[in-house]
Regions:
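Long, contiguous binding/interaction regions
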Residues: 1-58, 66-93
Length: 93
């Protein structure tokens, strides 16, 4: 198992409940590919460096997890399908 950080940039027009659901879905995705979440943080609504899909602000979320290395590619494919996530980045620790 390897340690990873998943940074999510989420649509700013979601309700607080919807933002929580995005975190829950991401944690579910991680578990589905064989990982285990160790920490999840909602950094809140922040201005982004450039517009994405017409938005100049977005919610930032950081999820730290451990998983087999091969699962990261599967996780990326799942995340790409989620319309609430504007951008994501997975970093191996």
């Amino acid at each position: 198992m390897h340690e990873f950080e998943l940074l999510l940039v989420v649509r700013p027009d979601l309700t607080e409940q919807s933002v929580k659901q995005v975190i829950e879905k991401a944690e579910e995705y991680i578990c589905r590919v064989g990982g285990k979440v160790s920490k999840a943080e909602n950094w809140g609504l922040k201005r982004i460096a450039y517009e994405i899909n017409g938005f100049d602000k977005a919610y930032y979320m950081l999820i730290m997890y451990s998983a087999p290395y091969v699962s990261s590619k599967s996780l990326q494919e799942i995340i790409k399908e989620d319309k609430d996530i504007l951008h994501h980045m997975i970093i191996r620790q």
